[in-house]
């Protein structure tokens, strides 16, 4: 079904587009230039109208004469239409900025209607990100509202003006750290650079460089007597104890990621994602930053009404979308109490009702797990731990202890005993069943401060003493809201290093998600969701798709190059079969690599060999291969290599989750824009928020070492949509990403975070890392 939806794009007047473009070759490397003295490459970009500098140091300009002191040579004159589409869009974006329509100007307009807000030590600043998309020969400005979370203190203040503390801070936060230059009106965000092998930050203690970049800001941005006084009031005199930090642009969209610049700790503040903050602060900030579609739309309309220019339209654009058919919603198969595989619709229940029968309700049919891992069947006893955060109130601790015990009883009585008795009746046709899991009265209750390193170490020591000689343990953890996601991650990782799979339940859930009929229990669906998640982590799967893909296998990959004690890890691969059943999860171990890059020929060859170890041959098969992000040229070469070596037909496309396009409607749909497909596979159930589409682009068929580019078809879109139904982390919610991509990314993150790799668990689909 078709519909019209407003999106965050406005049409650009074609009068801005030049007839002629001039191309120049730049001889000196911008990076070398920066090391010598400074910023001529930046001055070139700022002081000449209409400049785009490509990764190969070609200058694309609207002007015939450049004011530039470096070495370059004119290469020719071309028409605008001869430029590649991406360079056309970059140049139009630059011309908009030079006509007074830039991120800085639009962000100022936005803040008339949505003020910055302070949350403790953090300030949340509404801002605008801009990009340009070419669609049907017209250009559109994408206006995306974001919220930047930044420290109230400068980086230099945060580290107590101590160079050693600065280095430690940068090392500790190197994965996610972004720094904003607050002494520039552009407020550009940068990412610090680190040494290739030592991973230490690239710091320069040369006082001349520090003075140069301090004075650069004054001369460029604060060059009137009044402005200089304001600069000194805000930032003080230059502190020559601080080192300069070599950094690169954080945005890969607007600027060449290889360009470097020096930052002064005195003039920058760290910026954050909400996930990096303590959860109580993060929750407040996330609540503030969530905007309903109508709220976003209204803010953009207010901005456009303030723009005094005819270069862009004053109204947001509409686009035609295709709604996802309702019959695709519940495409799953389950096993009934006789062990037969049936569509869930035949049992007249929904996915969210898979476990309702465990409350001894005759209203709901018994549903057996679709498959139980052999490894899990053989375990006779699993130690059970209840871990309580001492920061919780006593009544919450007592409630959590009792609730976790009841959940365990549900697993033991309803799942283990009843499944086994039912399974015995069904053994003639199916080998189904859970082991007898004897938790009764044997759980260990541990209470410690989970917000402290000492408390976490104490938990690990106590669990370790109980896990001697045991293959697998299970822990339910009650944690306060104040714990950051990093602390959650550390606790779960340390427990799994002892073979203990854990399930965290936070304070909000324990306090606010009570059953309305029995305040001594959690809400019924919350209980079943927790059971579903725990059993998924233990490898127990309750359903497959009632749908067949036109592929032998679907594989999600993620690249995570790093040195581990057991060898060099290149990343992860997660395999699903043609009916959406998760078959194998494997780490890709490869030979020693140089730097952060991975030899993708070796990566994909190892992937094929790894699956072969489990008697899954990819030779002569057709596979759909997906990853989170763009398939790089290096990865494409690797796929050409295995397609020829093993006679594999590979279909792949980019699956991009981070982009600025938003559609102001909360429904499952897809639309074509600028040669890409934007798919919204989920509908938000929460009170606030705007659905974020995933972008599907650049479909390739790789066969016999050759690449054929094709358009993404409606069937491709439906395949991706169906793959988002395979969520083992929630009994009812939909996923934003297709399942193979989601789980490959989760496992790659676990590898990066030093989780123990248990290949015997992974081989049977244990999702312990989720």
From Swiss-Prot:
EC category: hydrolase
Q: Which residues fall in a coiled-coil region? A: none
Domains: what does the record tell us? Has 4 domains; N-terminal, PAZ, Mid and PIWI. The N-terminal, Mid and PIWI domains form a crescent-shaped base with a stalk rising from the end of the N-terminal domain that holds the PAZ domain above the cresent. A groove is present in the center of the crescent closed off by the PAZ domain, in which the putative active sites are found. The PIWI domain assumes an RNase H fold and has the catalytic residues.
Q: Temperature profile of activity?
A: Optimum temperature is 87-99.9 degrees Celsius, has very low activity at 37 degrees Celsius after 16 hours.
* Cofactor binding comment, as recorded: Probably binds 2 Mn(2+) per subunit; only 1 is seen in the structure. Mn(2+) is the preferred cation for cleavage, Co(2+) can be used but not Mg(2+), Ca(2+), Cu(2+), Fe(2+) or Ni(2+).
Limits of the PAZ domain:
154-272
Q: Write down the Gene3D superfamilies for this protein, in alphabetical order.
A: 3.40.50.2300, 3.90.70.180, Ribonuclease H-like superfamily/Ribonuclease H
Species source reads Pyrococcus furiosus (strain ATCC 43587 / DSM 3638 / JCM 8422 / Vc1)
Point out the gene that encodes the protein.
Answer: ago
What's this one used for in biotech? Can be used to create artificial restriction enzymes using denatured tDNA with appropriate guide DNAs. Multiple gDNAs can be used in a single reaction. This is particularly useful when cloning a region without any known restriction enzyme sites. Can be used to detect nucleic acids at the attomolar range (10(-18)).
Q: What is the effect of changing residue 745 to A?
A: Impaired target DNA cleavage
Cofactors per UniProt? Mn(2+)
Q: Which family does it belong to?
A: Belongs to the argonaute family. Long pAgo subfamily.
- Briefly, what is this protein's role? A DNA-guided ssDNA endonuclease that may play a role in defense against invading mobile genetic elements. Uses short 5'-phospho-ssDNA sequences as guides (gDNA) to bind complementary target strands, resulting in cleavage of the target DNA (tDNA). Endonucleolytically cleaves DNA in short dsDNA (the gDNA indicates where to cleave on the tDNA). Efficient guide-dependent target DNA cleavage requires a minimal gDNA length of 15 nucleotides (nt) and works up to at least 31 nt. Overexpression decreases plasmid transformation efficiency. Has no appreciable activity with gRNA or on target RNA.
Region: Interdomain connector, residue numbers: 276-361
Asked whether the keyword Lipid biosynthesis is assigned, the reply is no
Residues holding Mn(2+) 2: 558
The protein's name is: Protein argonaute
Q: What is the effect of changing residue 596 to A?
A: Impaired target DNA cleavage
For this UniProt record, the keywords arranged alphabetically read as follows: DNA-binding, Endonuclease, Hydrolase, Manganese, Metal-binding, Nuclease
Region labeled N-terminal domain — which residues? 1-151
The record lists the lineage as: Archaea, Methanobacteriati, Methanobacteriota, Thermococci, Thermococcales
